[in-house]
């Protein structure tokens, strides 16, 4: 009888241990499921830009990379307006109807459309905007972002160092782009301090670009490529004009030097987009309001020199510039 009782007790103890182990395994397997629910929300984010262009695509990639690094899970709705403001307005109206959690607007016209169409309850983050104040983007409760304001003073100094005898700077811009108008006005204000005069040509669409380039190429010493969406879209065509006229191109963005322009100095669009993404993460994950985050001007200037164009034009770059520059070669699209 004692042997039987011992057997029953032993069986009971073993059974209890097995049940205990089984419960632990069950709890362990359920634990990750509890953790996985933390931050598992997928945010609906609308992305838009006025045109499809490498510089703007770089800003978009920087934005996504910053959100990914911050741990934001996102369902992106990526729309391009094809340089048509009526399309841009419709895109923003659709984002509003879809009740996006956040909208990222790349370039000034896109940001202006977002400001006008997106409800005040939805955060709007912009990037690659030259002059947020002139664009009417300052003081809007649900709007903030990053400015890629061109370093005009620094670029005028670079022009003078590169071409000591130069007198006339040529510039082409789309008069309907507020960011471009602002940049041209600032250039004209500052050029005289560095011994330059500005030869400007305004266009209303891309079909006028080559004719404008042919016209001013006869009367300038250097062409200044600014952050204008029309210039960016037709840069390859006008670069041919300036190369044939032996007019060097200095640009505000590395996308121009990568595309064959002689030299660029500015902040990369990728860095601008990345900082915009960091701001978006603060809003989505930490609950910050856009009006609690000041608009930032991203300034991390880089000089790039296109080796092929330098050889084509036969220009000798001073050592003072070379030692702080990165040499690049033309990237084929």
Question: Positions of the model-derived regions?
Answer:
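Bacterial lipoprotein signal-peptidase II cleavage site
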Residues: 19-31
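Extracytoplasmic "Venus flytrap"
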Residues: 40-64, 70, 77-86, 176, ...
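An alpha-beta-alpha
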Residues: 45, 49, 63, 148-194, ...
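Structural motif
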Residues: 75-97, 202-216
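Beta-alpha junction/loop-to-helix N-cap segments that form part of ligand/metal-binding clefts
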Residues: 80-136, 228-243, 247-250
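Short beta-strand elements at the ligand-binding edges of bilobed clamshell
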Residues: 135-160, 259-274
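Pocket-lining segment of extracytoplasmic ligand-binding domains
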Residues: 178-254
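Hinge/cleft segment of the Venus flytrap/periplasmic-binding protein
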Residues: 282-333
């Amino acid at each position: 009888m004692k042997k039987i009782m011992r057997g029953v007790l032993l069986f009971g103890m073993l059974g209890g241990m097995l049940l205990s182990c089984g419960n632990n395994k069950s709890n362990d397997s359920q634990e990750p499921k509890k953790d996985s629910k933390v931050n598992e929300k997928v945010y609906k984010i609308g992305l838009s830009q006025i045109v499809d262009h490498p510089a703007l695509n770089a800003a978009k990639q920087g934005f996504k990379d910053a959100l990914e690094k911050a741990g934001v899970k996102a369902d992106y709705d990526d729309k391009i307006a094809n340089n048509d403001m009526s399309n841009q307005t419709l895109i923003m109206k659709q984002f509003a109807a879809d009740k996006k959690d956040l909208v990222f607007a790349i370039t000034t016209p896109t940001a202006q459309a977002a400001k006008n169409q997106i409800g005040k309850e939805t955060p709007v983050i912009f990037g690659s905007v030259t002059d947020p104040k002139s664009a009417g983007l300052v003081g809007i409760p649900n709007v903030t972002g990053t400015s890629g304001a061109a370093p005009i003073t620094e670029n005028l100094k670079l022009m003078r160092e590169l071409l000591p005898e130069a007198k006339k700077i040529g510039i082409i811009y789309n008069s309907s782009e507020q960011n471009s108008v602002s940049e041209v006005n600032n250039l004209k204000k500052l050029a005289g301090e560095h011994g330059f005069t500005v030869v400007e040509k305004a266009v209303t669409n891309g079909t006028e670009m080559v004719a404008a380039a042919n016209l001013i190429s006869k009367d300038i010493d250097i062409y200044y490529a600014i952050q204008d969406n029309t210039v960016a879209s037709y840069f390859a065509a006008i670069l041919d004009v300036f190369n044939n006229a032996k007019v060097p191109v200095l640009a505000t963005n590395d996308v121009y030097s990568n595309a064959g322009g002689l030299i660029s100095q500015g902040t990369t669009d990728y860095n601008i987009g990345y900082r915009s993404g960091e701001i978006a993460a603060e809003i989505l994950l930490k609950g910050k309001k856009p009006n609690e985050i000041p608009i930032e001007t991203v300034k991390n200037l880089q000089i790039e020199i296109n080796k092929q164009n330098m050889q084509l034009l036969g220009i000798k770059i001073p050592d003072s510039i070379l030692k702080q520059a990165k040499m690049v070669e033309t990237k084929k699209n």
